[in-house]
């Protein structure tokens, strides 16, 4: 449970909270299970704070420093986290439905099993983030950096990954049905047994990507760069490869 003194300091205002954090760097504030619905924490220093199981729905955390904070099982639905620093934060099984994380920094964060359905992650930095089993259905990841991200078994159905960077990302067994990957960069990405049915991969860069046993039924791969891609055992029924065929050298269509 939350430390009542820590909670009182948080609610006393930005000036007192900031001074206390500066004067007591050895203390890791405990705000677990706290009801912080709609609270304004814009720009606050929440680094290393325990917010597990807290309710931060509709909270304002714009440009907040949440580095290494613990948000396990926290409710952050509809929260505003634009340009927030969530690097190395633990957001496992957190509820981030419809949260706005535009331009946020989540490098190496733990989002295993997190619910990001409908979340805005456009231009966010998600390099080396762990999103295994996460729900990203209808999420906006336009121009996001997902290089080396772990997206195994993630649900990205109808997600917007237009011009996203997915170099070396692991999307094996992921659901990318009807997702937009137009102009996305998937250099050496792992897409083994992924569902890409009806996905939009127009002008996508799939150089050396592993698409073995992937489902690409009715996928749009026009002008995609598939040089060196592994399509062994993939289901390509109805897929459109116009302008991309000449780039496929590892497998015959």
Predicted segments with their positions:
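Eukaryotic acidic, serine/proline-rich intrinsically disordered low-complexity regions
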Residues: 1-12
């Amino acid at each position: 449970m939350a430390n009542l003194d820590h909670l009182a300091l948080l609610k006393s205002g930005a000036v007192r909270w900031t001074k206390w954090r500066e004067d007591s760097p050895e203390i890791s504030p405990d705000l677990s299970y706290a009801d912080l619905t709609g609270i304004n924490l814009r720009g606050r220093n929440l680094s290393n704070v325990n917010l597990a199981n807290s309710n931060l729905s509709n909270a304002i955390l714009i440009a907040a420093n949440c580095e290494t904070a613990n948000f396990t099982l926290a409710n952050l639905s509809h929260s505003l986290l634009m340009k927030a620093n969530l690097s190395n934060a633990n957001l496992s099984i957190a509820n981030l439905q419809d949260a706005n994380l535009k331009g946020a920094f989540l490098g190496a964060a733990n989002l295993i099993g997190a619910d990001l359905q409908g979340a805005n992650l456009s231009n966010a930095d998600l390099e080396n983030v762990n999103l295994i089993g996460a729900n990203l259905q209808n999420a906006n990841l336009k121009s996001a950096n997902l290089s080396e991200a772990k997206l195994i078994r993630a649900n990205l159905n109808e997600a917007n990954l237009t011009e996203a960077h997915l170099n070396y990302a692991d999307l094996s067994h992921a659901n990318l049905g009807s997702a937009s990957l137009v102009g996305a960069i998937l250099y050496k990405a792992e897409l083994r047994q992924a569902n890409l049915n009806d996905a939009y991969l127009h002008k996508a860069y799939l150089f050396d990507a592993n698409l073995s046993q992937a489902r690409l039924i009715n996928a749009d791969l026009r002008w995609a760069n598939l040089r060196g891609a592994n399509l062994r055992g993939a289901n390509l029924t109805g897929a459109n490869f116009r302008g991309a065929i000449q780039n496929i050298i590892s497998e015959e269509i």
